[in-house]
């Protein structure tokens, strides 16, 4: 999470936010959990799979900001993070690391601020979990209100996002795909643009902002 927090929005994030401000995009549904669309200025935004900047209690549902949790974890485990950094641990693409057993044994978990449970997790949808009902409802509302669906920079490999494409097509709405490589929705797309996402969105901005 700390590495992701240091990431900055790219030209595609900013272009989508500008297209929304110009009225060409009615909202953004993202599979990403990095919060970069919000930082770029997208206002009507649904993070379908959650946001790593939030923590949720598995017992009572109370949520907490990740920075707040980090502060509490640092207080409960003084010097722990510095010792880990000295190890120069390799972080896997999914964010996991392999730790020696003594690091796990010595770690003190902090409780939920509401119920005291220590069963806390990032507020993201892991593989095998379902998208929460309230997010599905917002997704349905956004899809019902739009006139077309634009898929940007995604292979649409996950079923929760592929379903959005299928739902749009069933509703008779055109689906456009912009992506630099092949994806699951390509064969069903009304329009397919195989190119870099940032460049494509800037060309769209030029066409809209006249």
Where would I find each of the regions flagged by the language model?
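Conserved catalytic alpha/beta core of Sir2/sirtuin-type deacylases, generalized to analogous enzyme cores
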Residues: 1-210
């Amino acid at each position: 999470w700390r590495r992701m927090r240091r990431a900055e929005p790219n030209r595609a994030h900013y272009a989508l936010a500008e297209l929304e401000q110009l009225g060409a995009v009615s909202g953004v549904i993202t599979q990403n959990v990095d919060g970069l669309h919000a930082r770029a200025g997208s206002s009507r935004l649904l993070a379908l799979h959650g946001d790593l900047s939030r923590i949720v209690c598995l017992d009572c549902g109370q949520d907490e900001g990740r920075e707040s949790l980090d502060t509490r974890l640092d207080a409960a485990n003084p010097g722990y993070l510095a010792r880990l950094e000295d190890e120069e641990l390799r972080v896997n693409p999914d964010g996991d690391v392999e730790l020696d057993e003594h690091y796990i044994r010595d770690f003190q978990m902090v409780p939920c601020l509401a119920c005291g449970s220590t069963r806390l997790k990032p507020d993201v949808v892991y593989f095998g979990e379902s998208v929460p009902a309230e997010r599905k409802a917002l997704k349905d509302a956004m899809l019902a209100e739009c006139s077309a669906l634009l898929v940007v920079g995604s292979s649409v490999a996950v079923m929760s996002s592929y379903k959005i494409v299928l739902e749009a097509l069933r509703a008779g709405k055109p689906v456009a795909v912009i992506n630099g490589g092949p994806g699951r929705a390509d064969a069903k797309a009304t329009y397919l643009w195989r190119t870099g996402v940032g460049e494509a969105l800037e060309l769209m901005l030029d066409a809209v902002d006249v």
